[in-house]
């Protein structure tokens, strides 16, 4: 899978040896929104033939992971990128606060149940990366994950990064192509979107005081993101940090990265069975 990933040309890919001193802050979107919509539509059409070959050949699985702060546009990006694709082999899993049952397992267990079969595209709306983001910002959440005392955070985070790297390397070796997207929204645009939710009756249900409280931890989240990117972006499972202030630009970029990745896979239709 490393050769496939190497074929993707994106300014947003985080190299393995990035050594980021701070989180990426590429907020500007240079394209016109109408132009981005048109390019998104063209890109979705270009993905369809690869999707059919993926499903028919069942040689590879695709795992797309979306992580972001609140109001960055994960839901919209997932909806728009996959809108015109055949739903037969696309499955979206949204991971919320862990249940009591999930907390009785290791932190990779609940997402492992939703991994793609060969021929399938699995989309994770949040993922096990919450365990090195939200939980790192709020380490008191660790108490619910352990029967006894929670591990020392200074030793826990390196152990979790290592577990994630080994998990993703195993998946890649077994034929899963992994693409991870950090949707990078600016504080100002995030605040504006919170206000927009209050103004729009169709979006008001999305508004949460909890989201407002979380936004006050922005500096802590930026630090956690920096560590996450540095520790877990690898050739077989790279991170793409995409500007999220412009929704249509974001969606087009995600679709184009997916298109490039699928185009680089050696997808083939299976040979028909011989007649007796």
Name these PLM-found stretches:
Residues 1-276:
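Flexible, compositionally biased loop and terminal segments
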